[in-house]
């Protein structure tokens, strides 16, 4: 197993957003519809960027050691698919599906930013696109795929696990520890108590993804899971990642 040490700066990064909106893309005025062929070309281009990257090789190597079953996935806040960030994050999700043998019919997307072209594109690939936001709940064998969502949305979903059974928590999203490290304890406890509790009580282990060059799509992305024994122990050199700030889209 790769052990990754996080070097943290003293710079504070406030989690913005009072309410849990879920889109991770700035969509104001983004109302143009795109053809399915164009969306596919954009996705293909993004998948090419990932295909031979060291980033993907590292992610595949590390996640392939995860032994707990994952049967379903909820994908929140992807954003408009024509954007580079969303197409890259969707490309990574396809790779994660391969690693865990996830079937499209067990993967549900929700983002209020989606327009009919996005919905059609995802449904044509066999995914479920939810018309309404899913109710946060403690879900067994379910991956939450939430790159760069607002802190308030992480807080809302974490509450379901903290108040029920944290052992079922599996999430691919921002490195939660950075929210705790970059805010005074009193502030994080009052604003995001479940993020604080999840981190300080060691309810989960996190695996930090490596840096991806030139684009913002995967900044501070981590795989969070409860049981450290889920990974096969391997003696390998430590890796260092500079995670000085938390990537988060405006809410």
Swiss-Prot record:
A Pfam family recorded for this sequence: SRR1
> Where is the secretion signal located?
none
A GO BP annotation: DNA damage response
Subcellular locations according to the entry = Cytoplasm; Nucleus
Q: Which InterPro entries match?
A: SRR1-like, SRR1L
A single cellular component GO annotation: cytoplasm
Q: Key word Nucleus present in the record?
A: yes
Q: Would you identify the family this protein belongs to, as annotated?
A: Belongs to the SRR1 family.
Q: What is this protein called?
A: SRR1-like protein
């Amino acid at each position: 197993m790769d052990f990754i040490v996080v070097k943290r700066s003293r710079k504070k990064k406030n989690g913005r957003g009072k309410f849990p909106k879920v889109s991770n893309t700035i969509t104001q005025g983004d109302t143009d519809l795109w053809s399915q062929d164009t969306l596919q070309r954009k996705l293909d281009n993004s998948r090419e960027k990932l295909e031979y990257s060291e980033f993907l090789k590292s992610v595949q190597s590390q996640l392939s050691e995860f032994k707990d079953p994952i049967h379903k996935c909820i994908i929140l806040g992807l954003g408009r698919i024509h954007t580079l960030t969303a197409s890259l994050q969707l490309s990574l999700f396809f790779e994660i599906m391969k690693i865990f043998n996830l079937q499209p019919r067990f993967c549900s997307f929700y983002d209020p930013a989606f327009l009919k072209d996005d919905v059609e594109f995802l449904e044509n690939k066999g995914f479920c696109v939810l018309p309404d936001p899913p109710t946060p709940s403690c879900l067994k064998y379910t991956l939450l795929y939430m790159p760069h969502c607002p802190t308030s949305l992480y807080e809302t979903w974490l509450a379901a696990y903290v108040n029920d059974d944290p052992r079922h928590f599996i999430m691919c999203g921002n490195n939660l520890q950075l929210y705790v490290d970059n805010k005074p304890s009193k502030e994080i406890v009052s604003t995001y108590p479940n993020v604080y509790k999840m981190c300080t009580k060691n309810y989960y282990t996190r695996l930090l993804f490596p840096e991806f060059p030139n684009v913002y799509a995967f900044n501070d992305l981590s795989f969070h899971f409860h049981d450290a024994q889920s990974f096969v122990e391997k003696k390998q050199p430590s890796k260092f990642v500079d995670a000085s700030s938390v990537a988060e889209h405006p809410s």
